[in-house]
Curated annotation (Swiss-Prot):
Pfam families: Aminotran_1_2. Its EC number is 2.3.1.47. It catalyses: 6-carboxyhexanoyl-[ACP] + L-alanine + H(+) = (8S)-8-amino-7-oxononanoate + holo-[ACP] + CO2. The lineage of its organism: Bacteria, Pseudomonadati, Pseudomonadota, Betaproteobacteria, Burkholderiales. The modification N6-(pyridoxal phosphate)lysine is found at K242. The gene is bioF. This is 8-amino-7-oxononanoate synthase. SUPFAM superfamilies: PLP-dependent transferases (SSF53383). Belongs to the class-II pyridoxal-phosphate-dependent aminotransferase family. BioF subfamily. GO terms for biological process: biotin biosynthetic process. It comes from Burkholderia multivorans (strain ATCC 17616 / 249). Substrate binds at R21, H137, T358. Pyridoxal 5'-phosphate binds at G112, Y113, S183, H211, T239.
Length: 394
């Protein structure tokens, strides 16, 4: 059997299991109301939590950045591609998200995946031990694999088991890595307990705040600020393509850690820098996030979250206890989840079906992503369609 035959059989297996993914094509800007595949829909699929992806100030800043710096960076950060826009943004990010450190410095990456790979692989070598939450994002998992370190996976948010594993560990370098807001459940890691364990056992805590940055904490400064945590043993990864509404990611840590990443993080060194216009737009986004408008958007999002939590409890399915913009509704089988997704789609609602391997088998779910761009009328429309789909599935 040749490779094409093998791949075709694999695709057929995915079809049979209800696991093949299908892309939809957006014909308009990311917003609550969009044109997708030629249809007008209300989208509950994006991670645009503050509704900034089409914000006029960010769009104008993007255009201004392109006029000033051009359309591309022209090279990697270490070989000619590092612009004044990148440098300015890194200084701003260190000040905005680095309150946990006495000497914070930031490093900008093109994607969150690359930032997580860098943070894990550059800090943990083959003689280290990494302790990873069982529900961590794939990018953290891939980072642990590429690091060649010993990896201990602890049950989700189980600090007792983690403590026992740390107690038994003899490695000189120990890293605890965790999402802050877990992307498919919406719950928040016990960060204060994790940091206490890290400091007790001489470990470092690496947190991926992809779904918390811009939303959690005072002025949206993130999960560490929300928990009022400070320590020199923290490494913070934030994403700029979700609540910030643009693209890219960053790592904030003690200045020595960041200098090490510049010298040794392969996902930073061996890739072309993001266009400076992107960094220029992120700088504009930070001003919105930290200002009165950002506060108003977070307050509206919080009200939407509470309304949605009440709605999900009225269905026949199993909501996850989430107080974040990620509101999952566990249905179970792939087939039933796809049927519910199609029922919502028939009402002009885009709510994605999340299936294995993204979530464990038997826990396929609808993942409702809320945005400050949504209105209560949008939620009322979701309520009508979701309750009808729930009744029809009974």
């Amino acid at each position: 059997m040749n490779l094409l035959d093998t791949l075709q059989r694999g695709l057929a297996d995915l079809d049979a299991q209800g696991l093949r993914r299908v892309r939809r094509t957006a014909d308009s800007a990311c917003d609550a109301h969009m044109t997708v595949n030629g249809r007008e829909i209300v989208g509950f699929a994006s991670n645009d939590y503050l509704g900034l992806a089409a914000h006029p100030k960010l769009v104008a800043a993007f255009a201004e950045g392109a006029q000033r710096y051009g359309s591309g960076s022209g090279g990697s950060h270490l070989l000619g591609g590092h612009s004044r826009a990148h440098a300015k943004l890194e200084d701003e990010l260190a000040g905005f998200a680095g309150g946990f450190s006495d000497a914070p410095r930031a490093l900008y990456f093109s994607t969150g995946y690359m930032a997580n790979l860098a943070a894990v692989t550059a800090l943990a070598g083959k003689d280290a031990t990494i302790f990873s939450d069982a529900l961590n994002h794939a990018s953290l998992i891939d980072g642990t694999r590429l690091s060649r370190a010993t990896v201990q996976v602890y049950p989700h948010a189980d600090t007792a088991t983690l403590g026992a594993l740390l107690e038994a560990c003899t490695s000189q370098t120990k890293l605890i890595v965790t999402d802050t807001v877990f992307s498919m459940d919406g719950d928040i890691a016990p960060l204060a307990e994790l940091l206490a364990l890290a400091e007790r056992h001489g470990a470092w805590l690496v947190v991926d705040d992809a779904h918390g940055f811009g939303v959690l904490g005072p002025q949206g400064r993130g999960a560490l600020a929300a928990a009022a945590l400070r320590s020199p043993h923290l490494v913070y990864v934030g994403t700029l393509g979700k609540a910030a509404g643009v693209a890219g990611a960053f790592v904030v840590a003690h200045e020595t850690v960041i200098e090490w990443l510049i010298q040794r993080a392969r996902s930073y060194i061996f890739t072309t820098a993001a266009p400076p216009a992107v960094a220029h737009a992120v700088s504009a986004s930070l001003k919105v996030i930290a200002g009165d408008e950002g506060d108003a958007r977070r307050a509206h999002l919080a009200a939407l979250i509470e309304r949605t939590r009440a709605l999900l409890r009225r269905t026949r399915w199993q909501p996850v206890d989430s107080h974040t913009a990620v509101q999952p509704l566990v249905i179970g089988s792939n087939e039933a989840t796809l049927a519910a997704m199609r029922a919502l789609d028939a009402h002009g609602l885009w709510v994605p079906a999340i299936r294995p391997p993204t979530v464990p088998a038997g826990t396929s779910r609808l993942r409702i992503s809320l945005s400050a761009a949504h209105s209560f009328d949008d939620l009322a429309r979701l309520e009508t369609a979701l309750l009808r789909a729930s009744e029809e599935a009974a």
